[in-house]
Amino acid sequence: SGSCEVKTCWWAQPDFRAIGDYLKDKYDSASEMAVEKHRESRGWVETLRARYALFKPPTERDLVYYEGSPNFCEPNPETGSFGTKDRTCNVTSHGIDGCDLLCCGRGHNTRTEKRKEKCHCIF
């Protein structure tokens, strides 16, 4: 009789939060690129180069962009964005739902509501 060993290897997906954090870090440190057109024997060729020579050139693992993001604060019918006017924000938050960021520095109005609701409490 013989013995048999089985070895199984597999790749596991990292935690979803870890993936999101990784992508956010990449986004925050993305390098702006410029498109340069030059003529070669096969015709016009477009290449990307770092827009600012002051910064180190991006590596193959860095995120790059060559067009700026649209202004999400203002409405844009072309993209279907309604902007952030009249959105509800969180006065106490310093995050993306906070009034300073969500209202794009335009200020905000505070509204206090008083409601009477049955709580269905049992004592």
UniProtKB/Swiss-Prot annotation:
Please give the Gene Ontology molecular function terms for this protein: cytokine activity; frizzled binding
| Pfam families in the cross-refs | wnt (PF00110)
Q: Posttranslational modification, per the record?
A: Palmitoleoylation is required for efficient binding to frizzled receptors. Depalmitoleoylation leads to Wnt signaling pathway inhibition.
What the entry lists under InterPro entries is as follows: Wnt (IPR005817), Wnt_C (IPR043158)
In Gene Ontology terms, what is a biological process of this protein? neuron differentiation
Q: Which UniProt keywords apply?
A: Developmental protein, Disulfide bond, Extracellular matrix, Glycoprotein, Lipoprotein, Secreted, Wnt signaling pathway
Lipidation annotated as O-palmitoleoyl serine: which positions? Answer: S1
- Protein's cellular compartments: Secreted, Extracellular space, Extracellular matrix
An example Gene Ontology cellular component term from the record? Answer: extracellular space
UniProt keyword annotation of Chloroplast present: no
Detail the disulphide connectivity of this chain as listed in its UniProt entry: C89-C104
Instruction: List all annotated glycosylation positions.
Output: N90
What transmembrane ranges does the database entry give?
none
- Report if keyword Glycoprotein is assigned: yes
Q: What does this protein do?
A: Ligand for members of the frizzled family of seven transmembrane receptors. Probable developmental protein. May be a signaling molecule which affects the development of discrete regions of tissues. Is likely to signal over only few cell diameters.
User: What is the similarity comment for this entry?
Assistant: Belongs to the Wnt family.
* UniProt name for this protein: Protein Wnt-3b
State which gene encodes it: WNT-3B
